[in-house]
Each structure stands twice: as structure tokens, then as C-alpha cells.
Curated annotation (Swiss-Prot):
The chain crosses the membrane at residues 3-23, 48-68, 89-109, 116-136, 151-171, 192-212, 225-245, 253-273. Catalyzes the dephosphorylation of undecaprenyl diphosphate (UPP). Confers resistance to bacitracin. This is Undecaprenyl-diphosphatase. Bacitracin is thought to be involved in the inhibition of peptidoglycan synthesis by sequestering undecaprenyl diphosphate, thereby reducing the pool of lipid carrier available. It comes from Anoxybacillus flavithermus (strain DSM 21510 / WK1). NCBIfam families: PRK00281.1-4 (NF001390), undec_PP_bacA (TIGR00753). One of its GO terms (biological process) is cell wall organization. It is a multi-pass membrane protein. The keyword Transmembrane applies. It catalyses: di-trans,octa-cis-undecaprenyl diphosphate + H2O = di-trans,octa-cis-undecaprenyl phosphate + phosphate + H(+). The gene is uppP. Keywords: Antibiotic resistance, Cell membrane, Cell shape, Cell wall biogenesis/degradation, Hydrolase, Membrane, Peptidoglycan synthesis, Transmembrane, Transmembrane helix.
């Protein structure tokens, strides 16, 4: 085992954790950091590297669970004390929000994996996602849902429809859902909270299915890389989520949209210029 490869695993976990929940496309960053620089497939193998990315994504999911643990306890009626009165987020809101993309994802998973995962499609997704985010800040409705507990079923469903755009690689799940939320009258913070809470079951489920299919690639020799990457992703996702939630109502989405366009330009220059 080489220390340099452990450092690469740590860096990949950092990139995953820092970008998974920000509206900047973790896929786009992995193209630059892994495919163009660290090349995890060289020390983990092609399928081992893909499994590694699933494992570090679970580190990010765990971070979201920690940040929103009180809300998850409330959703599952496990929170001690008096139950919140009045409007509140429920499991039905989550289900309604997940339904559209969940159905399309199951129906077209193989097609997406085979035909849509390429550098060119990610580049297109980065730019189109940026335009959606700019449009959300410019044309979003007057805020009627200040907090995640004010969200209606209609808003949740529309956000779910917009989330279907994230099936296109590079579009970004959080970028599409936060934009969709703002467009239908959620505050930026409410849209972000709903996005992150909704991401946990769908990411955990997808990762679990992938691991069941590919668990054999987590070998004894490769295990240290998986552990380091998982812990790194967890720590940096924890920091990134908390930082983003403090930031989003102040800076809104346009700065992230500009960053995405710059990232797309870098990928274009490196791959196509």
C-alpha cells in the first residue's frame, strides 16, 4: 500500500463531500479531479473505482443524516416531547417529491448509464443547470414557504418534477431542486433544507443497490482506501452542508451558477479545445 494512494482517496472523499450537496455538480468535479488527475481506476481497477465512489457518497449521506437528525426524528415520530402543531414537513411530502424522478430513474436507468454519462453531456448539464439557477433567482415567485415546514404537497411535487432534470449528468440534484423550490415560492433556505432531506433516502437507496451488486470489489487490500475516502467524505460533507445552509439565503444561486459555467469552460478547454 502506498501512502500517495491513500492521500488520493482522502482527496476524492474531500471533493465528494464538498460538492455532493452544493449546486455545482459533484459529477463534474469528479471528472476533473479523478478522471483527469488522480485516476483512482489505476490503483482500484475500473469497477473498484466505481464502487469506491458509491462508498464515499454514503459518507456524504451520513453527514446529511447527522445535520438533519432532529428533522428525521420528527418525520419518523421518534422525537421526544410535544409533537409540532400546525403545518409541518411529513413523509408524504418526501414521497411526493421523490416520486417523479424515482419513477423515471427506474425506467431509464440503463439508458442513462449507457448513453448519457460522458464528458460532453456533463458539460451540457453544467451549463443548462446554471441557466436554470439564474432563472430561479430572477423569476422565482414571492416567498410563501419560509421554512421547510411551510412547504405544500403541490410545491413538493413540482420540485420533484424539476428534479427529473438531474437525471441528466452534470445538472446537479441540489441545483435542480433548490431552483425548483425557489421558482414555486420557497425561500432559498427552505428549498435547500427540503433538497437535502429528500436526497437522503434516494441516495442511500441507490447506493445500497449498487453496493449489493458490486460488493466483491471491496477487497481486503482495497479496504483502507474505502475507509479513508468514506471518513473524508463524511467530514467534509458535514462542514460543507452547514456552511452552505448559512450562506444560501445571503448569496442566493447566481454565484454558484457562475462557478458552474467556469467549471464547464475548464472541462471544455481540457477535453475539446
Amino acid at each position: 500500500m502506498h501512502i500517495i494512494e491513500l492521500i488520493k482517496a482522502l482527496i476524492l472523499g474531500l471533493v465528494e463531500g464538498a460538492t455532493e450537496f452544493a449546486p455545482v455538480s459533484s459529477t463534474g468535479h469528479m471528472i476533473i479531479v479523478d478522471d483527469m488527475w488522480l485516476k483512482s481506476s489505476e490503483f482500484l481497477g475500473k469497477y473498484g473505482a466505481n464502487t469506491f465512489k458509491v462508498v464515499i457518497q454514503l459518507g456524504s449521506v451520513l453527514a446529511a443524516v447527522v445535520v438533519f437528525k432532529d428533522k428525521f426524528f420528527e418525520l419518523l415520530y421518534l422525537r421526544k416531547g410535544e409533537v409540532r402543531k400546525g403545518p409541518r414537513l411529513t413523509l408524504m411530502h418526501i414521497f411526493v417529491g421523490l416520486l417523479p424522478a424515482g419513477v423515471l430513474g427506474v425506467l431509464f436507468e440503463d439508458y442513462i448509464d449507457e448513453h448519457l454519462f460522458s464528458t460532453k453531456t456533463v458539460l451540457i448539464g453544467l451549463v443548462l443547470g446554471a441557466l436554470l439557477m439564474i432563472a430561479a433567482d430572477r423569476f422565482g415567485k414571492r416567498t410563501v414557504a419560509q421554512t421547510v415546514d411551510d412547504i405544500t404537497y403541490k410545491q413538493a411535487f413540482i420540485v420533484g418534477l424539476v428534479q427529473c432534470l438531474s437525471l441528466w449528468p452534470g445538472f446537479s440534484r441540489s441545483g435542480s431542486t433548490i431552483s425548483g423550490g425557489v421558482l414555486v415560492g420557497m425561500s432559498h433556505r427552505a428549498a435547500a433544507d427540503f433538497t437535502f432531506i429528500m436526497a437522503v433516502p434516494i441516495m442511500a437507496g441507490a447506493s445500497a443497490i449498487s453496493l449489493l451488486k458490486n460488493w466483491q470489489y471491496i477487497t481486503f487490500d482495497a479496504l483502507p482506501f474505502f475507509v479513508v475516502g468514506f471518513i473524508s467524505a463524511f467530514v467534509f460533507a458535514l462542514l460543507a452542508i452547514r456552511f452552505f445552509l448559512r450562506l444560501i439565503n445571503r448569496v442566493r444561486l447566481v454565484p454558484f451558477a457562475i462557478y458552474r459555467i467556469v467549471l464547464a469552460a475548464v472541462i471544455y478547454v481540457v477535453y475539446f479545445a
